[in-house]
UniProtKB/Swiss-Prot annotation:
Keywords: Chloroplast, DNA-directed RNA polymerase, Nucleotidyltransferase, Plastid, Transcription, Transferase. It catalyses: RNA(n) + a ribonucleoside 5'-triphosphate = RNA(n+1) + diphosphate. Belongs to the RNA polymerase alpha chain family. It is an enzyme of class 2 (transferase). This is DNA-directed RNA polymerase subunit alpha. Its EC number is 2.7.7.6. It is found in: Plastid, Chloroplast. Residues 1-233 are annotated as: Alpha N-terminal domain (alpha-NTD). One of its GO terms (cellular component) is DNA-directed RNA polymerase complex. Pfam families: RNA_pol_A_bac, RNA_pol_A_CTD, RNA_pol_L. In plastids the minimal PEP RNA polymerase catalytic core is composed of four subunits: alpha, beta, beta', and beta''. When a (nuclear-encoded) sigma factor is associated with the core the holoenzyme is formed, which can initiate transcription. InterPro entries: DNA-dir_RNA_pol_insert, DNA-dir_RNA_pol_RpoA/D/Rpb3, DNA-dir_RpoA, RBP11-like, RNAP_asu_C, RNApol_insert_sf. It comes from Solanum lycopersicum. It comes from the Eukaryota.
Length: 337
């Protein structure tokens, strides 16, 4: 095995890109280093940066489709090879780049026969398509394929509501995250009290922004989160006369579990990493050591399985359930926590 060598600063804290490549129109990769850091600083920065990269950066997605000719989501239309549901899933995968604030409208109007791709979407001037070749539908007959689209810029996830819409509109589960994945690793060097660290950060994006842009946006978001602490006044440190207090309801484990089981949703479990939820560092590290990285990995373990993890406690399972209820409505199988 050949050991890689990188040149690092010995005094001034600096970062630089050591690798950058474009694997496809919808997959960019970048690797960065930050050094020199004192012992423990690399892990602190790496964990915060990964969470910011995966959860704090905004992206643009198609969140709703409107067509008055479609009776319901799982119907089929004569002259179109795909079902309505398949078309919605294809539209969900369209990668957009924009400076949009809030929501905007777009449309598609194509006459068959032929293929409908992302390049057929009529967009406002401030929205771009990353990959024009992305497939949407196959028209097998000379029919008009006309639909309206709602585009939204946001962060995290948008889970569609379960009820039917009478106006012919169909919401789409949206994953706004432009960063597909992010990892960090640490290399230590030096001896004794002179020991220092190098932080490596790897970033994969969907092409709507480069890894370097993602690193910049994540850094800015972290800075914005910490700025209020610099302007904190002494008078604001304590609550007086019970003002601005929030009552907390008692936690009942079985009630929480029953509520989660009752509410059923389908979401992209493989795309949700456990460190994007607000788990404590201790719980996250315990799960990571057991090769549990995504929500799908987590839900494939029963309560008994989790209790076998070293240093895992029943209070940790309660915290996980609380977070699942807060952010997701999930179909939990019987005997799964």
């Amino acid at each position: 095995m050949v050991r890689e060598k990188v040149t690092v600063s010995t005094r001034t804290l600096q970062w630089k890109c050591v690798e950058s490549r474009t694997d496809s129109k919808r997959l960019y990769y970048g690797r960065f280093i930050l050094s020199p850091l004192m012992k423990g600083q690399a892990d602190t920065i790496g964990i915060a940066m990964r969470r910011a990269l995966l959860g704090e950066i905004e992206g643009t997605c198609i969140t709703r489709v409107k067509s008055e000719k479609v009776p319901h989501e799982y119907s089929t239309i004569t002259g179109i090879q795909e079902s309505v549901h398949e078309i919605l899933m294809n539209l969900k995968e369209i990668v957009l780049r924009s400076n949009l604030y809030g929501t905007s409208e777009a449309s598609i109007c194509v006459k068959g026969p032929g293929y409908v791709t992302a390049q057929d979407i009529i967009l406002p001037p401030y929205v771009e398509i990353v990959d024009n070749t992305q497939h949407i539908a196959s028209l097998t007959e000379p029919i008009d394929f006309c639909i309206g689209l709602q585009i939204e810029r946001n962060r995290g996830y948008l889970i569609k509501t379960p009820h039917n819409f009478q106006d012919g509109s169909y919401p789409i589960d949206a994953v706004f995250m432009p960063v597909r994945n992010a990892n960090h690793s640490i290399h230590s060097y030096g001896n004794g009290n002179e020991k220092q660290e190098i932080l490596f950060i790897e970033i994969w994006t969907n092409g709507s922004l480069t890894p370097k842009e993602a690193l910049h946006d994540a850094s800015r978001n972290l800075i914005d989160l910490f700025i209020p602490f610099l302007h904190m006044e002494e008078d604001n440190l304590y609550l007086q006369d019970n003002q601005h207090t929030v009552p907390l309801s008692p936690f009942t484990f079985h009630d929480k579990l029953a509520k989660l089981i009752k509410n059923k949703k389908k979401i992209a479990l493989k795309s949700i990493f456990i460190d994007q939820s607000e788990l404590s560092s201790r719980i996250y590290n315990c799960l990571k050591m057991s090769n549990i990285y995504t929500l799908l990995d987590l839900l494939n373990n029963s309560q008994e399985d989790l209790m076998k993890i070293e240093h895992f406690r029943s209070e940790d399972i309660k915290q996980i359930l609380d977070i699942l209820e807060k952010y997701f409505v999930i179909d939990l199988a019987k005997n799964k926590f």
